[in-house]
């Protein structure tokens, strides 16, 4: 748990000195993707799929990173990132080689980190994307 706090803390400030909104969120997604990959490598495909679903629905979509990306970076780009989550889940379900799952996982990690930095540099606030405001 201390490790998670340290990772999130390191990503908590954008270069401009403003608090980071999206980079800590990206690191939460990465933790679920890491868990999915680890679970898959030890043979627990069901837990691996659940971790991917949690990364996507529980963090990426529910916490509005997807919406922020769609409006700031673009719908086509966001769709391609979203598609990677589905590809990882499908690769796990179809029992692909762990190296294939790793490649997809690495693509997700790179994409969410890169895009979180873009959102933070653009000073996109999370509050804009909350429902019923």
Over which residues does each language-model region extend?
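Sec/Tat signal peptide C-region and signal peptidase I cleavage site
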Residues: 10-15
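Bacterial N-terminal signal peptides
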Residues: 2-9
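Mature extracytoplasmic or organellar-lumen-exposed domains after removal of signal/transit peptides
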Residues: 17-133
């Amino acid at each position: 748990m201390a490790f998670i706090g340290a990772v999130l803390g390191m990503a908590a400030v954008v270069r401009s000195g403003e608090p980071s909104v999206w980079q800590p969120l990206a690191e939460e997604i990465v933790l679920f993707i890491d868990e999915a990959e680890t679970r898959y490598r030890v043979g627990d495909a069901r837990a691996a799929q659940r971790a991917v679903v949690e990364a996507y629905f529980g963090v990426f979509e529910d916490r509005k990173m997807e919406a922020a990306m769609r409006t700031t970076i673009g719908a086509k780009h966001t769709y391609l990132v979203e598609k990677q989550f589905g590809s990882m889940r499908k690769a796990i379900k179809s029992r692909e080689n762990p190296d294939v799952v790793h490649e997809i996982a690495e693509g997700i990690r790179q994409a969410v980190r890169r895009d979180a930095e873009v959102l933070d540099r653009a000073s996109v606030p999370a509050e804009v994307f909350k429902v019923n405001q």
